[in-house]
Amino acid sequence: MTKTEKKLRHYITKAIADYKLLDKGDKVMLCLSGGKDSFGLLKVLHGLIEDKTYDIDLHVYTLDQSQPGWDDSQLRKYLDDLGVSYEIETKNTYGVIIDKVPEGKTYCSLCSRLRRGNIYRYAKEHKMDKIILGHHRDDLIQSLLMSILYQGQIKSMPPKFVTQDGENTVIRPMVLVQERDLIEFAKEENFPIIPCNLCGSQENLKRKKVKKLIQDLALENPKVPSNILNSLSNVLPSHLMDKNLLNSLEN
């Protein structure tokens, strides 16, 4: 086991323990997009199941969105060799996106909604206890700033949440993992990564701008990323302007 994998194991198991993400006997569905993050999470979590750290029933789900150039042959081989239960489901969400999104506009928002809808539907149909997503620490940091700057809200990606209809529980075991470690791990493991031909072709995305902003700030103060992350678990409601929060503090 490499130093990088040991580091990933440490932070993933810490998050699972700190936020009580897994229970014995859970039937879980890991969403494998074909990117480095979900591949890294799958490899580490599969190893933790193999060495009996967790007693859970793992199923891998991949959504083929019918994008031009999509080739999952190497992904299938990887999953077969790993010996995990999996399904690659084909849904033509790409066609919907191309039809609905005007030329020049970004696809990410609609693409994300359609993908999420299929994930939730599949999880309910197969009676999954939990849905596992591969978002990492940097995703949380960027999402917080994006919410503040572009939506006027203070929110990010929680380690665990229940969907509004109460039907699905979503967990993110990599909330403490840095993207740079996942990049290194992907190189070490040579994962058969499938690039996204949709978002990869759109350069002026808000997330990229926010990521660059954080990187620039970190050049002046390396603690900026960790400070932003720590702010998510160090909230002072009395110092905010939410009337409902302030009223609840007074009552």
Swiss-Prot record:
More details: The thiolation reaction likely consists of two steps: a first activation step by ATP to form an adenylated intermediate of the target base of tRNA, and a second nucleophilic substitution step of the sulfur (S) atom supplied by the hydrosulfide attached to the Fe-S cluster.
Name of the protein this chain belongs to: tRNA-cytidine(32) 2-sulfurtransferase 2
Keyword Transmembrane attributed: no
Record flagged with keyword Nucleus: no
Span(s) of short sequence motif PP-loop motif: 33-38
The encoding gene: ttcA2
Function: Catalyzes the ATP-dependent 2-thiolation of cytidine in position 32 of tRNA, to form 2-thiocytidine (s(2)C32). The sulfur atoms are provided by the cysteine/cysteine desulfurase (IscS) system.
Listed EC numbers: 2.8.1.-
Note on cofactor: Binds 1 [4Fe-4S] cluster per subunit. The cluster is chelated by three Cys residues, the fourth Fe has a free coordination site that may bind a sulfur atom transferred from the persulfide of IscS.
One GO-annotated biological process of the protein: tRNA thio-modification
Localization, UniProt: Cytoplasm
Family of the protein in this entry: Belongs to the TtcA family.
Subunit structure: Homodimer.
Alphabetical list of Gene3D superfamilies matching this protein: HUPs
InterPro entries: Rossmann-like_a/b/a_fold, TilS/TtcA_N, tRNA_Cyd_32_2_STrfase, tRNA_thiolation_TtcA_Ctu1
Any matching Pfam family: ATP_bind_3
Residues passing through the membrane, by range: none
Pathway: tRNA modification
GO cellular component: cytoplasm
Listed GO MF terms: 4 iron, 4 sulfur cluster binding; ATP binding; magnesium ion binding; sulfurtransferase activity; tRNA binding
Reaction(s) catalysed by this chain's protein: cytidine(32) in tRNA + S-sulfanyl-L-cysteinyl-[cysteine desulfurase] + AH2 + ATP = 2-thiocytidine(32) in tRNA + L-cysteinyl-[cysteine desulfurase] + A + AMP + diphosphate + H(+)
Cofactor entry: Mg(2+); [4Fe-4S] cluster
CDD domains assigned to the protein according to its UniProt record, in alphabetical order: TtcA-like
UniProt-annotated binding residues for [4Fe-4S] cluster: 108, 111, 199
